[in-house]
Design a protein with these regions (language model features):
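Structural helix-adjacent loops and short alpha-helical linkers that scaffold large soluble proteins
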Residues: 27-28, 46-51, 61-75, 82-95, ...
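Short proline/glycine-enriched turn/loop motifs at strand-loop junctions of beta-rich domains
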Residues: 392-398
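Carbohydrate-binding/catalytic loop surfaces
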Residues: 117-136, 179-197, 241-262, 302-326
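Glycine-centered tight-turn motifs at strand-turn-strand junctions
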Residues: 409-433
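Structural beta-strand segments of beta-rich domains
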Residues: 385-389
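Low-complexity, Ser/Thr/Pro/Gly-enriched N-terminal "stalk/linker" regions
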Residues: 26-141, 154-184, 301
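Well-ordered alpha-helical segments within folded domains of soluble proteins
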Residues: 75-85, 96, 138-154, 195-212, ...
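Long, well-ordered core segments of solenoidal/helical folds
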Residues: 103-135, 159-182, 218-243, 281-306, ...
Length: 460
């Protein structure tokens, strides 16, 4: 994923995602038509119809009075609602989250301040976390919301906040994959709404089970049990991707071929905690399938100097630290050999602790303090060429190049380069000569190293 982002940034084309075009949203039912159809079929009540239809009309009216960024953001959310209606995606269970999103955007963009990219906000009287996705409005940040709930649980003295947050989010789940899922209602990195995530759903499992263990509230256990559906179901409805070893749980339901490790590992942490608390044999089976796959692939994400984000490229600093934390959590659970034996199951049905998660987490922690290894590979270059200098680099780093002829600096360049044998641009002089080259590599954690060498440029 990072490799894709670097390439996109180089071309200046990376965006969160575009709103559905009016043409794309005009082939199926309109929003008002879809709501009316649900009402006439008795799928929704008069009260629900009136609330959602009124909210939709209010948002369209507000849009007409806005301009600039505010109009763009609210317009994108409206376009997403219209596109889902046209695609037949306005099912009854999806309406609460979808129209809450529309109303919160109408409220924010008519009365609130402009927001920075990825800025998070909340509303008075609510514990739900929202995030600004530029060009897509503000959207419910499910991972952050369930993470907030985990924080309330772990503090031990914020039970009222924990209850409020869970009581807010449970009614916002959508019927999906034979169970329920907390869906994202916006375009993101090629994904079209509505989509879901093994990462956020795994965190939901974890905190719902924890809350049930504390409060014995049946609704929390029921929601957690129903949330297992996406882990049993293949994309695009679910996130389960079968593998020779077991299964991997996709971070994005729309991108089953992306093997993003941090989201997968956190989904396993959530499944482990859910199963340890509830003793549910289905949870055990789902964890076992994912655990078998994780033990097979985790070593492949360790380059020896840094972590891989997915099968395509290295992690940025935030994701490296996040993956390390998730691996530490899984290490703590499996190293202790905590049995996950449901009532009535054979005594041997448990997780066998080993060191894969632990040693990898330790190595990733050490990587945060280890300088990159860099070497100059090019020794001779043709004059008047743009081929650049070839380097050897152990991990993703910001690399700076200085070229001197005698005491005179004749060329400088810098770039963020991934590991391997990348090239750094140097347009060599046509007249040739001998040049001193110095390179400095600074990794994403701030560790740096330098190297120097001599390059002979030959005449064309």
């Amino acid at each position: 994923m990072l490799a894709k982002r670097l390439a996109a940034l180089a071309l200046g084309v990376l965006v969160v995602g575009g709103a559905a075009s009016p043409a794309a949203a005009s082939h199926g039912p309109s929003v008002s038509g879809a709501l009316a159809s649900l009402l006439h079929s008795a799928a929704i009540s008069e009260a629900t119809y009136h609330q959602d239809y009124t909210g939709y009309v209010a948002a369209k009216s507000s849009l007409g009075r806005l301009s600039g960024t505010r109009r763009e953001e609210l317009g994108a959310v409206l376009a997403n609602v219209q596109a889902m209606a046209s695609a037949g995606e306005l099912i009854p269970s999806r309406l609460p989250a979808l129209f809450l999103t529309l109303e919160r955007n109408r409220q924010w963009w008519t009365t609130g301040p402009l927001l920075a990219d990825d800025e998070r906000v909340s509303f008075p009287g609510s514990e739900i976390v929202w995030e600004h996705y530029p060009g897509q409005g503000i959207e419910i940040q499910w991972l952050a919301s369930f993470g907030e709930a985990n924080g309330y649980y772990l503090s031990g003295d914020e039970n009222a906040d924990l209850r409020q947050l869970l009581n807010e989010v449970i009614p916002l789940a959508t019927r999906r994959a034979g169970g329920i899922a907390w869906e994202y209602m916006f375009h993101f990195d090629g994904g079209t709404p509505p989509w879901t995530s093994g990462l956020s759903q795994g965190t939901a499992l974890q905190v719902l089970a924890r809350a049930w263990s504390r409060f014995k509230e049946p609704a929390y256990l029921a929601a957690a049990q129903q949330a297992l559906g996406i882990f049993q179901t293949p994309p695009p409805q679910g996130v389960r991707v079968r593998t020779p070893a077991g299964a991997i749980y996709a971070e994005y339901s729309y991108a089953p071929s992306d093997r993003i490790l941090n989201g997968f590992i956190q989904s396993l942490v959530g499944l482990y905690d859910y199963t340890e608390i509830t003793k549910d044999p289905l949870g055990l089976a789902l964890f076992d399938a994912g655990d078998a796959e994780a033990r097979a692939i985790v070593p492949l994400y360790n380059t020896g100097a840094w972590s891989m984000y997915d099968q395509f490229g290295e992690s940025d600093l935030n994701y490296h630290e996040l993956l390390t934390e998730f691996l530490q959590h899984l290490c703590e659970r499996t190293r202790k050999g905590q049995p996950l034996t449901p009532a009535g199951s054979p005594a041997g049905a448990q997780i066998a602790g080993d060191q894969i998660y632990c040693t990898t987490a330790q190595q990733f922690t050490a990587d945060l303090h280890t300088p990159p290894a860099i070497a100059l590979l090019s020794r001779t270059l043709p004059g008047g060429a743009r081929g650049g200098l070839q380097l050897s680099l152990s991990k993703i780093s910001n690399v700076s190049l200085t070229v001197r002829q005698g005491s005179k600096v004749v060329w400088t360049n810098s770039a963020l380069l991934e590991r391997g044998r990348p090239r750094l641009l140097w347009i060599t002089p046509a007249k040739g000569g001998t040049f001193s080259v110095s390179l400095t590599a600074s990794d994403l954690a701030g560790n740096f190293s330098t190297t120097a060498g001599t390059v002979v440029v030959t005449r064309p």
